[in-house]
Amino acid sequence: MSANLQAAPDAGDFEYVGFWPRVGAAMIDTVLLLVICAPLVTLVYGRAYWTSDAFLQGPADFLINWLLPAIAVIVFWTYRQATPGKIAIGARIVDAETGEKPSTRQLIGRYLAYYVSIIPFMAGIVWVAFDPRKQGWHDKLAGTVVVRPKHRGPAPVTF
């Protein structure tokens, strides 16, 4: 099945993934990252890490909580076109113009563009709910869309 949304004859087999499914996918990803990162920072900094007022407690904090998640997300996007959360909902990231796999440059740009989406009161994330193609600002800046196959459920009921 081709991922090409504009030229492939099966482009109608895909739908844009909306706000709430993407929130669910993000929650799955957040829990997975928390399960990995929280024990690591606790191992390095001890339980006092969780009561500190410091934004960043040291180089290991940056590596574990900022760099490791960025690398993990970009690697998943590169090889699977989705994080585990998006995989769980059957979604994947594709180039907005061709429907094909996005370039590594697009994916890195998409990750960095999340900060643009998040900083102004999460407005760029909420934008997904109102955009006709269900693109957040990070998708628009990177030239990507999130899609999944239509008719994901069981066969229709027949009598």
Predicted feature residues:
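Short, small/hydrophobic-residue-rich motifs at membrane-helix boundaries and re-entrant hairpins
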Residues: 1-122, 136, 140-143, 147-159
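Low-complexity, intrinsically disordered Gly/Pro/Thr-rich segments
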Residues: 125-133
